């Protein structure tokens, strides 16, 4: 699924939107992706674009409490990934509500790709869907700064 999401971002980012599900399925099949993986990716993307925050506490976006990861979350999101999420929140890229949505979305992804790669992709999709990637420097700032942060 990760490869499909990367493919979609790389091929549709510049256009600002992506085609309907049937067209995407056809194009992804022609690109050689597996039908089951296509379905998983498109379902994940559909859920992602709805920004359902109903199950989260009111006022979470303004919260300044410390987040502790559950055992299950720590099994899926490694130390580097958790550190990157903390970095994004401290840098003001995401608020606590966006952090929770990010964690949920990363957990819903499958595969053996590193957590940081998944997290970066989810953040890119979130910013893309919210039309916050209009400034091409946003991507560079996010990833250059985060990469230098992780080297320390």
From Swiss-Prot:
Disulfide bridge partners, by residue number: none
Name the record gives this protein: Protein Smg homolog
Gene this protein is translated from: smg
InterPro entries to which the protein is assigned, alphabetical: Smg (IPR007456)
Family statement drawn from the similarity comment of this UniProt entry: Belongs to the Smg family.
Pfam families in alphabetical order: DUF494 (PF04361)
């Amino acid at each position: 699924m990760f490869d499909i999401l990367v493919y979609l971002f790389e091929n549709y980012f510049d256009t600002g939107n992506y085609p309907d599900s049937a067209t995407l399925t056809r194009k992804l099949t022609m690109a050689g992706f597996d039908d089951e993986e296509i379905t998983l990716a498109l379902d994940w993307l559909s859920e992602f674009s709805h920004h359902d925050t109903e199950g989260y506490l009111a006022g979470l976006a303004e919260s300044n409490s410390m987040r502790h990861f559950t055992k299950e979350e720590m099994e899926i999101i490694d130390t580097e990934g958790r550190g990157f999420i903390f970095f994004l929140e401290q840098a003001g890229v995401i608020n606590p509500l966006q952090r929770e949505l990010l964690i949920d979305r990363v957990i819903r992804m499958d595969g053996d790709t590193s957590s940081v790669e998944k997290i970066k992709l989810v953040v890119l999709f979130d910013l893309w869907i919210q039309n916050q990637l209009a400034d091409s420097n946003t991507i560079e700032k996010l990833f250059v700064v985060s990469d230098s942060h992780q080297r320390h």
